Design a protein with these regions (language model features):
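A short gly/proline-enriched turn/hairpin at secondary-structure junctions
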Residues: 31-41, 53-57, 113
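A beta-strand edge to alpha-helix "cap/lid" segment located at domain peripheries
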Residues: 1-2, 48-130
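Short, well-ordered alpha-helical segments enriched in acidic and aromatic residues
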Residues: 16-31
Length: 130
């Protein structure tokens, strides 16, 4: 499985609220940003607890729009993120950049950066490799 396929699988699992499927793509000691409260959560248990808490408050959906390899080997993903409140009202609609470090074919860490490098107007998915 390519890095892009692994990440697409993970985004699809997150959007389906299938925590077990998403965690199957992650290293047991994964480091994950807590985008709601700040800081970072660690490991499968930390992510499960964080996402469960998050989904009880908001309804986020993330769609990868393009992949790019960074010089240090990490994979950057331009993501369209739409966050709704539990009544369905859009509270956030933006492009963000997620940057992943992979280890042994699994996600080892992720960081969130504001805005994609190519801008939100980039046409369709873009994939570039190392």
């Amino acid at each position: 499985m390519t890095a892009e396929q692994l990440l697409e699988k993970t985004y699809a699992a997150f959007n389906a609220r299938d925590v077990d499927r998403a965690l199957s793509a992650m290293h047991p000691e994964v480091a994950w940003p807590n985008g709601m409260e700040g800081g970072c959560v660690h490991g499968h248990r930390g992510i499960r607890e964080y996402w469960t808490r998050q989904w009880g408050l908001i309804d986020p959906r993330v769609e990868p729009r393009g992949f790019e390899w960074e010089p240090d080997g990490r994979v950057a993903v331009d993501v369209h993120q739409v966050v709704r409140d539990l009544a369905g009202r859009v509270v956030k609609d933006e492009m963000v950049r997620h940057v992943y470090r992979l280890e042994a074919g699994l996600i080892r860490s992720m960081e969130i950066r504001s805005g994609p490098s190519r801008g939100a107007g980039a046409p369709g998915p873009t994939r570039t490799g190392p």
